Amino acid sequence: MNIFYLHQDPEQAARYQYNKHVVKMILESAQMLCTAHHCIMGSDADVPYKPAHRNHPSTIWARQSGQNYAWLYYHMMELGREYEKRYGKKHLTIVKCEDKLAKLPGGILETGLTEMPQCMPDEYKDECSIQAYWNYYINDKKNIANLKTEKLYEQRPKETY
């Protein structure tokens, strides 16, 4: 369970992800969003997935504010668009969750976008969560990439965070 926060724009953050993460992170994002509904609304939650990893820092972050929830929802949808672009079909999780998760859970706080938790080994952490996730992604997650077909490193933004 994680959110690869590679850019503050949820669309751009989705584009930067390796193929395997585009596939996997759609479901993980939906699970975190569904868990937000369960934790906030209890038995009134009408969402496709049961709660998962309630106490994971990323799952907690998703339900801390409406803005966090919205960021993750838009990121999930952008991952879905990336999936469709790369694989030519719609991800089943998007089919199940797009409408159900579009609405914020009733009672979620409106406290603004909060700092993304850094769910990674300490050696990659940084004052800036985006830089930390790039450190983690490039150094720890490159083994899942097909470097013959994926050109992530060329796409990486040149600015320092």
List where the protein language model places each region.
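Sequence termini and other peripheral, non-core segments
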Residues: 1-55, 59-161
